[in-house]
């Protein structure tokens, strides 16, 4: 009874703003990820085997990067229940929900700049990646330069990660899932779209295949919408397909095709 009361009080306390203070914090469905064969102190910034990547399916829906703000709703046994405001989701109007290890969070800093270089190094030696955030003046200007908001530049940003291993829930230069790749590419250009493929499909403006332009997103269903790719022109698309594959460019597929959605110039 006492434990249940304590948990209820934690959940009832006002949400606090915190900032991720590790290169990548994995967001878990529940605070029981200790059984997975991963060392949170070094992963995912080290090599991950296929079996380890497969073990994430259904357990780790997303990630948050260094400097990204989260709202802490509760703390429980070394874990923090959070929502991520910059990752819109129908699961919670406040942002993508999940659990991270409490030690991966710290005090928020003001006026962060988004890292648009593939990798950058903080003064303390920590290596952070594309999409992370850091206070102004901490990194060289070239590492946080503002990217133009054009279709061609959006496609080039996605192409930076060709050959990168697919990672379920991945949202960093160490691995993307399908919607993580599209979310990260758009966000680098100042456009926030929902985190998951089905939510991206629901939020975008419908266009036809004949109207499709580079940067538009193509969606596929099996049987519900569960995969997204970005059109790059010339009848081709870039995608992060599955745990056995890497980010790749392939011809546009019509099998299981559900529709095209537009976020740029809607």
Language-model segment annotations:
Residues 53-59, 119-126, 201-208:
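Short alpha-helix capping/helix-loop boundary micro-motifs
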Residues 2-10:
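Bacterial N-terminal signal peptides
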Residues 217, 226-235:
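Catalytic nucleophile-His microenvironment captured as a short glycine-rich beta-strand/loop
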Residues 31-52, 109-119, 185-199, 232-235:
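Short, basic/aromatic beta-hairpin or loop at an interaction surface
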Residues 12-39, 55, 66-68, 76, ...:
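Boundary regions of SH3-family modules and the immediately adjacent low-complexity/disordered segments
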Residues 43-44, 144, 205-206, 232-266:
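Aromatic- and glycine-rich peptidoglycan recognition patches
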Residues 165-213:
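Catalytic cysteine-centered active-site loop
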């Amino acid at each position: 009874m006492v434990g249940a009361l304590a948990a209820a009080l934690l959940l009832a306390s006002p949400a606090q703003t915190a900032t991720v203070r590790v290169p990548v914090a994995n967001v878990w469905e529940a605070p029981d990820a200790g059984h997975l064969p991963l060392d949170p102190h070094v992963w995912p910034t080290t090599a991950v085997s296929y079996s380890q990547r497969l073990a994430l399916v259904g357990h780790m829906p997303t990630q948050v990067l260094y400097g990204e703000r989260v709202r802490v709703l509760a703390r429980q046994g070394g874990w923090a229940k959070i929502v991520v405001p910059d990752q819109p989701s129908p699961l919670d109007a406040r942002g993508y929900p999940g659990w991270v290890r409490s030690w991966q969070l710290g005090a928020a800093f003001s006026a962060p700049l988004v890292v648009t270089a593939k990798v950058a190094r903080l003064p303390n030696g920590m290596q952070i990646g594309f999409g992370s955030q850091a206070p102004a003046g901490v990194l060289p200007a070239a590492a946080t330069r503002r990217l133009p908001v054009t279709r061609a530049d959006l496609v080039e940003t996605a192409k930076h990660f060709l050959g990168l291993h697919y990672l379920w829930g991945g949202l960093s230069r160490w691995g993307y899932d399908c919607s993580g790749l599209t979310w990260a590419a758009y966000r680098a250009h100042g456009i926030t779209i929902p985190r998951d493929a089905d939510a991206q499909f629901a939020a975008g403006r419908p266009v036809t295949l004949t109207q499709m332009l580079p940067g538009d997103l193509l969606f596929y269903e099996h049987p519900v919408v569960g995969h997204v790719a970005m059109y790059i022109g010339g009848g081709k698309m870039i995608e992060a397909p599955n745990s056995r594959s890497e980010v790749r460019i392939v011809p546009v597929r019509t099998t299981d095709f559900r529709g095209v959605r537009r976020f740029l110039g809607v």
